[in-house]
Amino acid sequence: MKTNLNYCIVLSSEQLAYLAGSKYGIDRMKILHQLIEAAVLEENDYAIKGFSTTLQVGQAILSEVDLSSKLDYDKKTISRVLDKMNQLRIVASAQSNRTSVHTLKCISAWMENGNRIDNPFYVRIKNRQEEGENTGALSNLSLIHI
């Protein structure tokens, strides 16, 4: 059965400016796109030799090497972009000796075949301001993938 999947993405002006920018031909949105596509929509056990975890809704498992080979970008470039995405709180990444778990913080929800799936890791813009996670002017941008 083919699913109809839409994404509710909320970004601050600073986050959007970073993702829209490009340096040395690197498309940062492509990297975010790979993470969004890899995110699970229900709890999922994951195991490879020497590593196992339970992925929650809104988490993706992709190593920097995997991202590098999928996008044909240098691994060091992927690492720098992910570091900046973490700094801007677009994602939160945790590395192990085998792979990385990326928690998507910019996705508020998914709509799958008309059913809303909330992201438990999403932090509302209002709460980001109160927590001091983002300073300066913020604007909401909701993108729906059709």
Positions of predicted regions on the chain:
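Conserved small/polar residues in nucleotide/adenosyl-binding loops
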Residues: I144-I146
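A contiguous pocket-lining binding segment that forms or flanks enzyme active sites
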Residues: I117-N140
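Short, cationic-aromatic polyanion-contact patches
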Residues: N97-R116
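Winged helix-turn-helix DNA-binding recognition segment
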Residues: A39-T103
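Alpha-helix boundary/capping detector
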Residues: I61, S93-A94, W110-E112, E130
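Short recognition helix of helix-turn-helix/winged-helix DNA-binding domains
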Residues: M1-V57, L62-V65
